[in-house]
């Protein structure tokens, strides 16, 4: 309904979940269990595709996109590249978070510091 775009217009940081439909569909193809196939189909209805997440960030004119709750969570750099590929040419200023990602936004400036909790 556009509410995320409406309420995130011009923000410094948009924190958004994302699903890779391509990867989930590949998982469905190799799923040995009908129950898992159904789950992998159902989750596509209530998670935002990664491309749409980028479009929301672009159309809302956000400064930076932090992607959390990635479905499925990329397990290596190849999977991460496939997961993030739909953002190419749509929105380039993003970070894929994982456990331990920390965001610091100091008061008084527009700096966004993203690092890991050690």
Predicted feature residues:
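Cap/insert and terminal regions of metallo-dependent hydrolase folds
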Residues: 2-98
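Core dinuclear metal-dependent hydrolase active-site scaffold
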Residues: 1-9, 102-118
